[in-house]
Curated annotation (Swiss-Prot):
The lineage of its organism: Bacteria, Pseudomonadati, Pseudomonadota, Alphaproteobacteria, Rickettsiales. Nucleoside triphosphate pyrophosphatase. May have a dual role in cell division arrest and in preventing the incorporation of modified nucleotides into cellular nucleic acids. Keywords: Cytoplasm, Hydrolase, Nucleotide metabolism. It comes from Ehrlichia canis (strain Jake). It catalyses: a ribonucleoside 5'-triphosphate + H2O = a ribonucleoside 5'-phosphate + diphosphate + H(+); a 2'-deoxyribonucleoside 5'-triphosphate + H2O = a 2'-deoxyribonucleoside 5'-phosphate + diphosphate + H(+). GO terms for cellular component: cytoplasm. This is Nucleoside triphosphate pyrophosphatase. Its main location: cytoplasm. It is found in: Cytoplasm. Its EC number is 3.6.1.9. Belongs to the Maf family. One of its GO terms (molecular function) is nucleoside triphosphate diphosphatase activity. The active site is at residue 73.
Amino acid sequence: MLKFDNLILASSSKQRLSLLEQIGVVPGEIISPDIDEVILKKELPKAYSIRIAQAKCEKVKLLHPDKFVLSADTVVCCGRRILPKVETEEQALECIRLISGRRHRVYTTVCLYTPHGKLHCRNVVTVVKFKNLSVQEIDAYIDSRQWYGKSGACSIQTNAGKFVLSINGSYSSIIGLPLYETYSILNRYFSI
């Protein structure tokens, strides 16, 4: 694994850091950008994911204009409805009931700002289908609290993975960072 001192990961996500390490990249610094993640009226999931990932990148870039800044944002949606990053059992229950037995989409955008002011962004959409969950399965998942802080209450890399019937797209993108797209962007500037 290589540590890139001039690369900042603009994220507090442990999953994103772990995924970066899978492609042999360790950022020199990790900064959690504090941005407003409010959903705009009539904003579609893909546009929201792109806007938030860019905002994270731009916030950190203002503080460190001479560094590369990598950011990402993951959004879970059912239809056009963007599901929240859940913080309460009530929110988690609502989201899990909504996606039970249905397909939902996961949009992840990865962005890289260069020291030269160039912005690279890639958006990946993955379709996930959950089995029809019983009341007992929903209750057990809610009790596990593995949904906390996750978009749409989904944590398929942990306990919720057993509910997935199919994935059409990028598994790593669902967890928070599309590896192929991230590698492709970083490989333009770093030897990985």
